C-alpha cells in the first residue's frame, strides 16, 4: 500500500511538472483573456459534468467571493447549480442541451465561456461551446487526455496531458487556482 501511495504521488508530480512546462503560455493567455473581458463588463459562464461540475462551481466561487485578495466580486456563473433549470431542460430538450440552452439565455457577445471536461468529449459541453461561439463569446476548454473534440472548437484549449481522470482533475484544480491568483493580481494589483 505504501508503494501505491508513493506511485500516485509521483504520478501527480509528473502531471504538475508537465503543466508547468507545457501549459504556462496558455494559462497566461487565459488570464489576459479573462482580465480583458471581466475588466470590460463582460461575464464568465462555466460548465462541466460530475467532478468537472464541482470544479466549475469552485472557479466561480473564487471569483464571485474572493481567492486571496479583498476586492469586489467578479461576474461569473456556474451553469451546473440550478437543479430546476437543469432538470427542466434535461426533461424537455434532452441532457445534451442542459448547458447550451442556458448559454442561449445568458451569454452575450464578448462574454467568456469555459467548458471543463476530463475527456474532452462531453457532448453537452461541446454543444454549449458551439452555441457560445455563434453568439460571439470567447471560449476556453479545460480538458484532459488529448483534448478530444472540444479542443478543436475552443479559442484556447488547456489540455492536461494525462489519461488518468483523477490526475487530470488535480491538474484542473491547480490551473483554476493559478488562474484565480493571477487574475486577481492582474485586475486589482498586488494588494492583499
Curated annotation (Swiss-Prot):
Reaction(s) the record says it catalyses: 2 D-sedoheptulose 7-phosphate = D-glycero-alpha-D-manno-heptose 7-phosphate + D-glycero-beta-D-manno-heptose 7-phosphate
Cofactor(s) listed: Zn(2+)
EC number: 5.3.1.28
Subcellular location per the Swiss-Prot or TrEMBL entry: Cytoplasm
Every SIS domain range: 34-192
Any one Gene Ontology molecular-function term assigned to this protein's record: carbohydrate derivative binding
GO biological process, any: D-glycero-D-manno-heptose 7-phosphate biosynthetic process
Keywords tagged on the record: Carbohydrate metabolism, Cytoplasm, Isomerase, Metal-binding, Zinc
Residues holding Zn(2+): 58, 62, 169, 177
Origin superkingdom: Bacteria
Disulfide bonds: none
Keyword Nuclease in record: no
Cofactor note: Binds 1 zinc ion per subunit.
Keyword hit for Metal-binding: yes
Subunit structure, interactors included: Homotetramer.
NCBIfam families named in the record: gmhA
Function: Catalyzes the isomerization of sedoheptulose 7-phosphate in D-glycero-D-manno-heptose 7-phosphate.
Family label: Belongs to the SIS family. GmhA subfamily.
Protein name: Phosphoheptose isomerase
Origin species: Geotalea daltonii (strain DSM 22248 / JCM 15807 / FRC-32)
Amino acid at each position: 500500500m505504501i508503494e501505491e501511495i508513493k506511485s500516485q504521488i509521483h504520478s501527480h508530480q509528473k502531471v504538475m511538472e508537465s503543466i508547468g512546462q507545457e501549459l504556462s503560455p496558455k494559462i497566461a493567455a487565459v488570464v489576459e483573456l479573462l482580465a480583458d473581458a471581466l475588466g470590460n463588463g463582460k461575464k464568465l459562464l462555466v460548465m462541466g459534468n460530475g467532478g468537472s461540475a464541482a470544479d466549475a462551481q469552485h472557479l466561480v466561487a473564487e471569483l464571485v467571493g474572493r481567492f486571496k485578495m479583498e476586492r469586489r466580486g467578479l461576474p461569473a456563473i456556474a451553469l451546473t447549480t440550478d437543479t430546476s433549470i437543469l432538470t427542466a431542460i434535461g426533461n424537455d430538450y434532452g441532457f445534451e442541451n442542459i448547458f447550451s440552452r442556458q448559454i442561449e439565455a445568458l451569454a452575450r457577445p464578448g462574454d467568456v465561456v469555459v467548458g471543463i471536461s476530463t475527456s474532452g468529449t462531453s457532448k453537452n459541453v461541446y454543444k454549449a461551446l458551439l452555441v457560445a461561439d455563434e453568439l460571439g463569446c470567447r471560449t476556453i476548454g479545460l480538458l484532459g487526455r488529448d483534448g478530444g473534440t472540444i479542443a478543436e472548437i475552443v479559442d484556447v484549449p488547456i489540455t492536461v496531458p494525462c489519461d488518468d481522470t483523477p490526475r487530470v482533475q488535480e491538474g484542473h484544480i491547480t490551473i483554476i487556482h493559478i488562474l484565480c491568483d493571477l487574475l486577481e493580481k492582474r485586475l486589482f494589483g498586488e494588494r492583499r
